[in-house]
């Protein structure tokens, strides 16, 4: 299994970088993992709808450069489908069994994702109806991917 995470924006906080490094190491026992950071656009305070749209489109162009044609695309979206950890593990396992050996997760920037990216998504995943900082979302996603591989492998995990 190959897992790619495309994320808008850089991680600036050391504690988040440390967590990302740790979960990346743990996941490497089960899967090849690539994390791709694309630059975020500077967002003015109180942007207009037109400004928001332009920002999302610029970020989408950067994301599109890294999407692989045969990868199963999962976008993280507040209006996506909420899954339990077991459901996510099943989804990943089912994809593997059906011959999909490549999964790409996309995390948008502070304004979310462009419709252009959302529309080509194979699956829209939501972790919560709440909003999280996109930098923290990367850590949460990595932890859930790691947990999924442990569940798939029949290994113990914290419930």
UniProtKB/Swiss-Prot annotation:
Molecular functions (GO terms): rRNA (pseudouridine-N3-)-methyltransferase activity
Binding site for S-adenosyl-L-methionine: 76, 108, 127-132
Annotated keywords: Cytoplasm, Methyltransferase, rRNA processing, S-adenosyl-L-methionine, Transferase
Record-stated family: Belongs to the RNA methyltransferase RlmH family.
UniProt name for this protein: Putative ribosomal RNA large subunit methyltransferase H
Gene Ontology CC: cytoplasm
Catalysed conversion reaction: pseudouridine(1915) in 23S rRNA + S-adenosyl-L-methionine = N(3)-methylpseudouridine(1915) in 23S rRNA + S-adenosyl-L-homocysteine + H(+)
Lineage: Archaea, Methanobacteriati, Methanobacteriota, Methanomada group, Methanococci
Membrane-spanning intervals of the chain: none
InterPro entries in UniProt: Alpha/beta_knot_MTases, RlmH-like, tRNA_m1G_MTases_N
PANTHER family: METHYLTRANSFERASE (PTHR33603), RIBOSOMAL RNA LARGE SUBUNIT METHYLTRANSFERASE H (PTHR33603:SF1)
Domain of life: Archaea
Protein function: Specifically methylates the pseudouridine at position 1915 (m3Psi1915) in 23S rRNA.
Protein EC: 2.1.1.177
Pfam families per the UniProt record, alphabetical: SPOUT_MTase (PF02590)
Compartment(s): Cytoplasm
Listed SUPFAM superfamilies: alpha/beta knot
